[in-house]
Every structure is written in C-alpha cells, then in structure tokens.
Regions:
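Beta-rich catalytic cores
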Residues: 2-4, 39, 74, 166
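Short, solvent-exposed loop/turn segments at secondary-structure boundaries
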Residues: 1, 30-35, 68-70, 194-196
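Structured alpha-helical segments in the cores of large, soluble enzyme domains
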Residues: 6-8, 45, 76-80
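Solenoidal tandem-repeat scaffolds enriched in leucines and small polar residues
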Residues: 16-19, 23-57, 61-63
Length: 209
C-alpha cells in the first residue's frame, strides 16, 4: 500500500528486515487528512528456514491511538509458506493486542507450478479465511470480496469486519507472459462473537494479465 514516511530495508538472499515510520495513504485511511491519520511504526522480518520453508513476522503500532477491546493499538502477526515440489501449504495469523475477537488467520493448500512467463503452466489453491468480529482485511494479498472497504450486512457500515469463508483460485498461462486467473469465494458468513451469523453471497472474478 501507499506509504508516506521513512523506511529502512536490509537483507540478503536468505533474510530480509524492514522498518518504517510514517503515514499510510491508501486502504483503510484513504481520503483522511494528516490530523485524522495517525502515524504508524512498523517492523518486519522474513527469511528462508531452508529450501522448503519460509517464515515471517511483523509488529505494527498505531501511534497516538487509544485502543479498546474493539480496536487495536499494537498489532502483530506471523506467516509461513512451505513448498515441496509442486505442493504448497501456507498460512498467516494476526492479533490485535488487547482486543476481544481481535484475531485473524488464513490457511491454504495448493498444487501446481504456475509461471506466467511459461505457456501451459498452472496451479490451483484452496484457502480458508477467518477474521474475528473486530478484524477486517485491508488491501489483502488475496482477492476476497468481503474486505474492510465493503459495507456490512446491514448496509450502514462501510468498514466491514468479521468474516469467514473459502476462496478457490486457479492460474493458467495462456501464452508466454499472458496469464488467466479465476477466483471463486463460497460458504461465506459473518463472524460475530455472539448471535447468529449471516450468510453472505458467493462471488467470482476472472483476471487476464
């Protein structure tokens, strides 16, 4: 996402470290002026444990923000990607410190060897997403429809939080450097701390790159 501030990066082929301080200017804070937009402090590290396993972790602090049990001041998370030949298994976990129902996680499995530069290559993935009642996906790496920018089930709140569901993804290289990607999201529901969850519509999307 867009970021206005100072950033420091260091690393090698095995380990990468990043630290940053400043303002986010896209995603959940798009359109806010400087007075409305708090600064963030961010640090992350990721690296290869071996040729099959990649691990990562991050910490973010929403400066000058008073946290409560529905919003975060300190946020941290971990991720992993495991690859054996054509099989991929991966997941992410994020926690808003001090928040009630302030966790989010995803886990997935895939098969294939898609390379957009090589005609005929392909892969498929299936992933499950679970965002606690007070967590929303902001500019997610994955193309889920129910992210923070969407309206909630009542149609009155455009900061959508609390979601769980599945996403299937397929990639295929039609020609060298021409790829087709199809997404299908299904079995989607809200993720309330109490009460009955609402069913959400299935969705699909196709991209040509």
């Amino acid at each position: 996402d867009g970021f206005d501030g100072a950033q420091f990066n260091v690393g090698n082929d095995k380990v990468q470290f990043q630290a940053a301080y400043g303002y986010a200017v896209e995603g959940a804070v798009e359109g806010k002026n400087q007075k409305e937009n708090n600064t963030f402090t961010y640090a992350s590290i990721k690296g290869d444990l071996n040729k099959h396993v990649n691990l990562g972790g991050f910490y973010a602090r929403n400066n000058k923000h008073k946290s409560d049990n529905t919003d975060f001041k300190n946020l941290y998370g971990f991720s992993t990607d495991v690859n054996f030949d054509k099989v991929w298994v991966g997941g992410e976990y994020v926690k808003g410190a001090g928040m009630n129902k302030g966790t989010a996680w995803t886990a997935g499995i895939g098969y294939g060897a898609y390379d957009q530069a090589k005609k005929g290559t392909w892969d498929v993935k299936a992933q499950y997403f679970n965002f606690g009642q007070y967590m929303g996906a902001v500019s997610s790496t994955w193309d889920i429809a129910y992210d923070f920018s969407q309206t909630d089930a009542t149609g009155t709140n455009n900061n959508f939080k609390g979601f769980k569901g599945w996403l299937a993804t397929a990639n295929y290289a039609l020609q060298d450097n021409v790829g087709l990607t199809a997404y299908y999201g299904f079995n989607n529901k809200t993720n309330k701390a109490t009460g009955t969850n609402d069913k959400l519509s299935n969705y699909y999307r196709v991209d040509l790159n």
